[in-house]
Regions:
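Sec-dependent N-terminal signal peptides
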Residues: 1-17
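Structured extracytoplasmic
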Residues: 19-194, 201-208, 212-231, 236-249, ...
Length: 310
């Protein structure tokens, strides 16, 4: 649950950008001046929108570890979930296929299908409602904050060039402006955020992001989640097939209260793997896993094996 709140707050998490073709003319990382951060952010925003079709074509496996801490900061409970992330009826969903290393029973799978159907219906309605108001949204209907608004809500500083995974990358630090006026709770999250972004210089896409929150913030007015200040996150993205950037790993740590009832204090670690592309509109192939025409995941015997912790 903490992961959902962290990803929502990160804004860019879960968004995947189109990758530019590899250039044959390699330029030394320090041989040219850094582009203006504002210009770079607008390019990232444009690339995200242009990559929408490619994002829909991909599915991947998601392994999630949730470690809950006791009052002394020691791990008291660990929950492991394996899912298949896919675009189903226009909505990006994570269909659970196993919990704690055990595949779902037929009864559990039926309940999961019901949950997915309700989630798709809810997200589709929210997307149509927000888009009818002229808002730009993701596939789940959440309103996207534009690059222009992010620049109004905070400041980017200390731009520099580094090499990340062998690729020239531009890094900049971000600090929200506590005096900035916000229009909704999502903007409040961005305003209260302090962190760092890594932008791939060739593709102009987000490659990594990390940050922490200076104040408490609420999702859905606190009805969905109430995240406490000091909560932090880090997300990394992977270039797949030289055409698209997909989620790689996400880590989050902090305190959150869910649905005004259950509290959670701990750490979450997510690893995405087994990236596959639709060959036809019916079946996802490539790699070892297959998804049936109705979207039901058919994991291989090793699909529920937790990936190694980085």
């Amino acid at each position: 649950m903490l992961l959902l709140a962290v990803l929502y707050a990160a804004g860019w998490s879960g968004q995947m950008q189109a990758a530019a073709p590899t250039s044959k003319a390699d330029v030394t990382a320090d041989a040219k001046p850094l582009p203006p951060i504002a210009e770079l952010l607008h390019d990232v925003e444009r690339n995200q929108k242009a990559a929408e079709t490619q994002r829909k074509d991909y599915t991947y496996h998601v392994h999630l570890d949730e470690q809950e801490f006791d009052g002394k900061g020691q791990v008291k409970k660990t929950v492991r979930t394996d899912s298949e992330s896919m675009n189903l009826r226009g909505v990006r969903i994570n269909r659970v296929v196993a919990r704690d290393g055990k595949p779902l029973t037929p009864e559990q799978a039926a309940k999961e299908n019901e949950r997915i159907d309700k989630e798709i219906a809810r997200d589709t309605e929210r997307r149509e409602k927000n888009q009818s108001k002229g808002e730009s949204t993701d596939s789940r209907g959440d309103v996207l904050i534009s690059a222009s608004r992010i620049l109004e809500l905070g400041t980017f500083s200390n731009p520099r060039r580094v090499t990340l995974n062998g690729r020239p990358t531009i890094v900049a630090d971000y600090a929200g402006d506590p005096n900035a006026k916000t229009r909704n709770s999502a903007e409040g999250v961005i305003r209260d955020l302090v962190g760092t972004v890594w932008i791939d210089e060739q593709d102009h896409t987000l490659a990594r992001a990390q940050g922490h929150f200076l104040n408490d913030f609420k999702i859905g007015g606190g009805l969905v989640a109430d995240v406490k200040k000091g909560s932090s996150f880090e997300a990394q993205f992977i270039r797949v097939n030289n055409e698209v950037w997909l989620p790689g790993t996400v880590d989050g740590q902090g305190k959150v209260r869910i649905l005004l009832v259950s509290g959670f204090s701990g750490h979450v670690h997510l690893v995405a793997s087994d990236y596959r592309k639709f060959r036809t509109s019916a079946t996802i192939v490539s790699g070892d896993a297959i998804v049936a025409p109705d979207g039901t995941p058919l994991p291989t015997a090793g699909a529920t094996t937790p990936p190694p912790h980085p």
